């Protein structure tokens, strides 16, 4: 069942990829039903808060009529960052399943483990579900981004002599 819902999260990650966003997708499931979906929209929304998990949690809370998601499992293609791990704790989500680890910002196992700290909620974690697919999508995105950035025109450096008299 975990692979089935991780595949749904990967569909959302691919949508983010196509829109020029870091390809992370998330679904929240209660029983056998998806109650929340989210994908990264930081560029589109011009917001540091527009992460896949935050979007999915907000939708699940609206759909279920409350902020406690006690009977839910969160599936996300990339290990949650500190902000998203905090949102998971606050929403009381009992189980988190993620695909790829995040060695730069992962707050579940890679960099730190917020779920093991002295908070009032400690989700169960399953990792590595469809990890290769999730990691490949992220690698392709960042490889394309590096090429794009390398080919962008650079700003011309202003020489100090050119700046004189412009006060």
Language-model regions: role of each:
Residues 1-19, 83-167:
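Zinc-dependent deaminase
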Residues 24-32:
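Short beta-strand scaffold segments in enzyme catalytic cores
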Residues 26, 65-66, 115-117:
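Short secondary-structure boundary/capping segments
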Residues 20-24, 70:
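Short, basic and Ser/Thr-rich N-terminal targeting/leader segments
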Residues 49, 54, 58-91, 95:
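Helix-adjacent hinge/juxtasegments
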Residues 41-44:
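A short acidic/small-residue loop/turn micro-motif
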Residues 4, 33, 55:
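Active-site phosphate/pyrophosphate-handling residues
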């Amino acid at each position: 069942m975990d692979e089935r819902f991780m595949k749904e999260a990967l569909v959302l990650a691919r949508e983010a990829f196509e829109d020029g966003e870091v390809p992370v997708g998330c679904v929240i499931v209660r029983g056998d039903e998806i109650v929340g979906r989210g994908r990264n929209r930081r560029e589109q929304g011009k917001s540091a808060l527009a992460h896949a998990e935050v979007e999915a949690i907000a939708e699940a809370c609206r759909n279920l009529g409350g902020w406690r998601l006690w009977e839910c499992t969160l599936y996300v293609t990339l290990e949650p960052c500190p902000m998203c791990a905090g949102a998971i704790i606050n929403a009381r989500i009992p189980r988190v399943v993620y695909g790829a680890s995040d060695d730069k910002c992962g707050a579940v196992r890679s960099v730190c483990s917020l779920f093991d700290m002295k908070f009032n909620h400690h989700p169960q974690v399953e990792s590595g579900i469809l990890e290769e697919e999730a990691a490949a999508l992220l690698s392709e995105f960042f490889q394309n981004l590096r090429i794009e950035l390398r080919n962008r025109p650079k700003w011309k450096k202003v020489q100090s002599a050119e700046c004189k008299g412009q006060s």
